Regions:
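Membrane-embedded transmembrane alpha-helical bundles that form the catalytic cores
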Residues: 1-330
Length: 330
């Protein structure tokens, strides 16, 4: 029963989101060896939010199998959980144990909750239409220009840094609207972003960025693969696998695969060099000055994350790599 349920969920996601991508990738790979292959292509429109509600459904099936969640006998409560409209476009990815009991609890009007929810919605709209769109205009003036290669390194670097903040505002704004809408209807949703761009390490950043997705991968992929229980090498491999899948979840393209793997590499390198970096900075008096240390750590984390985010905007791996090289004068 578990295998059938997982196959149905993953099969639907593969059919709608990854069939064409894998066919095109296989064709390109064979062409590089001089073998001509025409990949079949499906002219289909994927359901809105398929990545989100598929993961919600997968989490439910696995939790029921593990005994963490009772199988819901009322189909309508299950359907409401999987397709709860505030969550299916930008998340958060909720768990059945968190949402279904709320659906079954009678709701009463709470002025503070409703007004707080409406304010959260307005804040989300402000972040999206004022902050993100304004930053997007500046970023598009550089990266949206076919001749953007003529720009100097500092301009490209500034555009890249702004794009990271634009993406954060864009993405978190959708979650703000979702959480606000949930509050208006009487439901508490999971916080998905906790000021991730203020993080001082890559590990901390991924504890604050897209929290519901990160925790989903931790519980349903990273830990089942062995987590950190089988030695350092296996831990790093597991982390790379998780971020590879995360990249594919965000988008069916090679640039998203690179985005995921690059995040995983930074995370692994950061953990592998943690002790060495502490020894290196132990005798630096400036580094012991807390404000300087915090600013430096936050700036480095932001820059590294930006080098990943460039692939989010790029349709091709080469384009993303060129953007990084140009920004650094390479």
């Amino acid at each position: 029963c578990l295998v059938v349920s997982l196959a149905l969920c993953v099969g639907c996601l593969f059919y709608y989101k990854y069939f064409n991508f894998l066919g095109e990738t296989l064709a390109a790979l064979l062409d590089s060896f001089g073998l001509h292959y025409t990949a079949p292509s499906l002219d289909i429109l994927a359901p809105v939010g398929i990545s989100y509600f598929t993961f919600a459904a997968l989490g439910y099936v696995i939790d029921v199998y593990r005994g963490r969640q009772r199988a819901e006998k009322n189909f309508f409560f299950y359907a409401l959980f999987v397709s709860f409209f505030p969550c299916i476009v930008t998340g958060p990815i909720e768990r059945a144990e968190h949402m279904i009991p709320q659906f079954k609890t009678p709701q009463t009007f709470d002025y503070a909750r409703v007004s707080g929810g409406l304010f959260r919605i307005l804040w989300g709209f402000f972040k999206k239409f004022v902050i993100a769109n304004t930053l997007g205009t500046a970023v598009d003036a550089v990266y949206g220009n076919p001749g953007y290669g003529a720009y100097t390194g500092p301009i490209l670097l500034l555009a890249s840094l702004l794009y990271t903040y634009q993406l954060y505002c864009d993405f978190s704004a959708g979650c703000d609207v979702a959480l606000g809408a949930g509050a208006v209807f009487g439901f508490e949703l999971t916080e998905n972003f906790r000021q991730p761009l203020h993080a001082r390490s890559f590990t901390e950043l991924w504890r604050r960025w897209h929290i519901s997705l990160t925790s989903w991968f931790r519980d349903y992929l990273y830990i089942p693969l062995g987590g950190n229980r089988r030695g350092k090498a296996r831990q790093y491999i597991n982390q790379l696998v998780v971020f590879l899948v995360s990249g594919l979840w965000h988008g069916a393209s090679l640039s998203m695969v690179v985005w995921g793997l690059l995040n995983g590499v930074y995370l692994c390198v950061g953990k592998a060099t943690q002790d060495a970096r502490r020894k290196l900075t132990r005798h630096n008096p400036l580094y012991h000055f807390t404000p300087v240390r915090r600013i430096f750590q936050t700036a480095v984390t932001y820059l590294l994350f930006t080098s990943c985010i460039i692939f989010f905007r790029s349709s091709e791996v080469f384009e993303g790599s060129k953007g990084i090289a140009d920004a650094l004068y390479i």
